[in-house]
Amino acid sequence: MCGKLYVVATPIGNLADFSYRAIETLKTVDLIAAEDTRHVKMLLQHYAINNQLISLHQHNEEQAAPGLVEKLKSGMNIALVSDAGTPLLSDPGMPLVKLAKQQGVDVSPIPGACALIAALSVSGLPVTRFTFEGFLPRTSSARKSFFSERKNESATWVFYESSHRILASLEDLLEIMGSDRRIVVARELTKLFETVVNDTLDNVLEQVRNDRNMQKGEFVVMVEGAVIEKNVTEITEEQSRVLQTLLKECSIKTAVAMAVEITGARKKVLYRAALDMKGNN
C-alpha cells in the first residue's frame, strides 16, 4: 500500500499559529523532510515530536526526491516542512511533490501560516488578482530590469526581501516605478515587532531609510498594480445625443461640462466631439 506525502505549513513567527492537525500529522508520519533539520528540530522539540528527520534543501532536492518517492511507494508516510510557512513558496519541495504526483502518490496539504497570504490580507491593496515573484535578484542592475518588466502590471505584485537588501531594493524600485506608486512593506509578521506600512513609495523609502529598526527582519513587499487608462476616443450614441442637445443652447465649454456630469464620459473626448459637431454645422 502506497504511503502519503503531507505538505505541512509551520509558523512564520508565532508558535501559537501551529495547528493541532499539523502537530498530530508530524507526530504520526514515518519521516519528516525538512529544509534545515537543525531549525525544524527546535520546533519539533517544543511539541515533543521525535520523529526521524531528513534534510531536503535547494542543493539536494533533485537528487533526494527519487529516494523519498520510493519510500512513499513502499508504504511510508512522509511530511514535508520548510523552516517557516508553507513549503514550495520560495522554499524547497517542488521536485518531491512533482515526482510524487507523477508516480501516483497521494499528496495532501496541511495548511497554515503563509507570509504571502498573511501580508496580502492586511495590505489594503487589491487582492482579486496578484502575482507572487518570490525573492528578488541580488544585483541592482538585475532588479531594475526585473522592475521595468513589471512596471505596467495591473495586478498587485508581491516579493520577499531580506534585511541586508531591503533598502537597496526599495531605492531601485523608486527609480523605476516613480515616487507616487503605492506600496506596502510588511515586516516580521506575527512576531513581536510586526510592522505594516502602507504609503507612496517615496514615503515608505524615507521611513525605512531613517529607521534602522525598519531595516531588520524578514520582509514582504507588495506593489500596487499600474492604473491602465483605457484609450477611449469615441462617444456613444446616447452621449452624442446629450451633447448635441446641450450645444443648441450652450457654449462648447458649458455644454461639455454639463455632458460630463450627465453621461460620465471623459471631458477630453466630449470636447473633441463638440468641436467636430460645431465644425460640421
Whereabouts are the PLM-identified features?
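Short active-site oxyanion
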Residues: 26-32, 104-108, 156-157
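Class I SAM-dependent methyltransferase SAM-binding "motif I" and its flanking Rossmann-like core
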Residues: 95-153
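General beta-strand structural signal in soluble alpha/beta enzymes
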Residues: 34, 107-112, 159, 185
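Conserved helicase motor
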Residues: 56-62, 136-139
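A contiguous loop/helix-start segment that scaffolds small-molecule binding in enzyme catalytic cores
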Residues: 2, 156, 163-281
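Ordered, amphipathic secondary-structure segments that act as subunit-interaction surfaces
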Residues: 74-84, 89-92, 161
